[in-house]
Amino acid sequence: MKKVRHILGIIGIGVLALVLGLLIFAMLWTMDIWRHITFDEIVYHLFAPIKGTNPDVIWSFIFRALTPSLLIAAALVTLNIVLKKKANKQKLVKIINVAVSLVLVVSLGITTFCFCNKYDVVGYFQNIGESSDFIQDNYVDPNTVVLQAPGEQRNLIYIFLESMEATYSDKDSGGAYDDNYIPNLTNYALNEGCCFNGSTGKLNGALSLHGATFTSGAMVAQTAGLPAMEEVGNAAGTQDTFYPGATTIGDILAKEGYNQELLVGSDAVFGGRAQYFSGHGNYKIFDYVYAMENGYIPQGYKVWWGYEDEKLFDFAKQEILDLASKPEPFNFTMLTVDTHFEDGWVCDLCEDKYPGNQYANVISCSDKQVYEFVEWIKTQEFYENTTIVICGDHITMDSNFCEKIEPSYERKTFCVILNAVPAEPAEERYFSTFDPIS
């Protein structure tokens, strides 16, 4: 019996050290990796499917959170086993166990305080307990209004740009930097398309509000006008449909006979995107898994979150031409990924225009790729009857790229509509990523 208690005691102290260590290192890892996210995003991704997550993120957690926790627990267990074999070391074992446990508990308390303060965890739970009339006062259910289709149905190409901000332009154009990292996108917004900037001559963009500050939430916001709350993230991992009660752009266009497709360079299951788009408009899902299963990329090929944007744009051209060859109008939606935090993915097309600033180089490369893609679209016969929407999904979560921006500067996602009908409105609009559907 004494031996059993001895074994259980060693197991208990090991498990305690592992759990406390994991909590501490997980919070430290989160605060270092995700410096610019909100607690609702953390909760959302805790419940969303892990399938499709960038393996770099998983390995980072393993090395920086799980491994040190296991080492502490293993060291403490080993120490207990070795010292408890010696009769004169029993008191020392107890002192060590109490001391280590005390250090871990105090460290957990300090880390938890810093974590809660950084992510306003208390405010998050206070908000959960309060009701809000925001949706009731501002959301218009598409089912309650008369939507009249135009005489000639127009094609829609909706390009979600990962973490793309109007912020990345130069100060003279309405951005926050001395350099313009997105000259082509800036030109589209100020000289060719509509960014709802009125007569300001400056870039205008969309605010990222609660429930739309991460990719899945942002895509739901822009296509449904609703926030993707954490309980929806939970449902996305267990249900065949995502937000079943919502009416989205996909639902509306499906009723009008549109062929629809979603193209992403990652696993569309991640964040519930596959469920959402297939359940709202019966989109064809062309993602990383589809590309591999159908020979677009070699078996086992994987960079970044799946495959890089250089391939994404090539696949987009093929898919759009296929859609355009059919008699029905089409809605082609795509999402880039190279500009995802941390620091983005440097592909073969990227130039070292900004030495020592990888993220700036990746953003500049994305700007160039989008430009070449849009210019290709303009040369196609279907373009005259096609509207292009280019929007950042949310502001970047990169840990340091925007650190030196003036606190008074209001960061917004990039947004422009090309070849719009009717023409650009004269008035300036102050809008969020919930508004494009309107």
Model-derived features: where do they sit?
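Transmembrane and membrane-interface helices of multi-pass
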Residues: 1-126
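Polar/charged alpha-helical tracts
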Residues: 2-10, 60, 81, 89-94, ...
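Short extracytoplasmic/periplasmic juxtamembrane "stem" segments immediately C-terminal to an N-terminal membrane anchor
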Residues: 45-46, 125-142
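Short linear sequence motifs
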Residues: 117-118, 127, 132, 276
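Solvent-exposed soluble domains appended to multi-pass membrane proteins
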Residues: 141-438
